[in-house]
Amino acid sequence: THLSARVGLIAADDRAGSFYSNPSTAVLCKNRDSVWIFYFPEYGKDVHCGMKSEHLVGTSIPRFTFDTPTTPGNDFYKLCEGEHPLVMIFLPAFDHPVTREYLTRYLQTLPRLRGVRLACVVRSSPRMVAKATQGAEFPFTLICDAPGVLYGYLGVEQARGILSWSFTAQRIYKAAKEQGYRYNSNAPQQLPLTLVVGHMGKILFTHSGRSQTDLPEDCAAIREITREVVRTMAEDQRRAHPHCSDETLTLPDLVGWGDLDGSSN
């Protein structure tokens, strides 16, 4: 059984963290809450605990096992081995209003995710999520990290009060409050983190949210971000090897991502 396209608010237990960055280079796109920026340093560095976002691209997340609401002990590197790019979005607890809002958006727009795989990370236990969803399966991967191990490893921090707010966040909280949700507006809040990840956990792109809602607004936005990452990687490869034939396979071709590096919709 798959979830319906509306994720209900179950409780008000928000184990929050956040992540911020000093991104650089070219602007990718804009929406009402954010400006998306590419950062592509040289590849091959090892990642260390507590690294800032400007050092994440080109590093590899170590191999680990994770639990989903229905399946324990999944291999992260196996998840990375798929023939399509993997986008990871770090959210607050499953029952947090922002998490509920964006999971709902992703469920509603899932058909527009063609050629991309999605994994959302929530700071809730598998048991809590399974209870809230009555054991229903998500149509994309939901990684449960209640202790915040991944958040901590990637250097996730917190933003307080108005620094983490946006107009969209205000609307989300207003609607949640009308449904009985209570929160401390001055408490630390987690800011989202969006990654595009390749094989062996290599981080190809990172965007650290400047507000609670500075993340892809739906599956169409997720796909467009990933297409730009693939295009940029292919262009970088062509610049690095200018004497190669046009028939030489690009990195997206080699990993089966060619369907994103074109004009198809």
Description of each model-found segment:
Residues 100-153:
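Structural microenvironment flanking redox-active thiols in thiol-disulfide oxidoreductases
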Residues 40-85, 132, 183-265:
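Non-globular targeting/processing and membrane-anchoring segments
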Residues 1-14:
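Extreme N-terminal basic, low-complexity initiation segments
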Residues 79-106:
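Short active-site neighborhood of thiol/selenol oxidoreductases, capturing the structured segment around
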